[in-house]
Amino acid sequence: MPQALPFPIRKECPPGACECGRDELLDAWDKAPDDTDIRVLRLTREQEKVLIERIESIATYEELGHIKQRILEQLGVRLTITPSAHGVSTVMGLSIKLVEQPGLCRRTRENLPAAVRRCFRNNPDIVYALLNSRDLLGIEPA
């Protein structure tokens, strides 16, 4: 018998519309709840909208770091932002991705990086601070 989930989770996407592995993640959690991280399922569509608004309202590089850390802590999802090896002349020169993992919806993997790009377009100082935070070899400090 399936265990009750400790929190409300994201509704499943229509069949064929997403390859997130939500059902497989839930099955794995059902078999071994202590070994399976289901935090990513906490991000419902409504909460995703709130998170997108929050990301778009980021005003400083420090806020960006805080949001990245909170996403990792609360959802177990890593947001990576790396400049192109060929240089960055626009926001499109940055690679902004959510690391793929079971349960992470395709729409979320597209929507959150798009929100970060919109934030960067509205606040180019964040991009400058991001680029300045890396050393000459392009390595982010630990």
Q: What does each model-found stretch correspond to?
A:
Residues 1-142:
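Extreme N-terminal regulatory/targeting segments of RNA polymerase sigma factors
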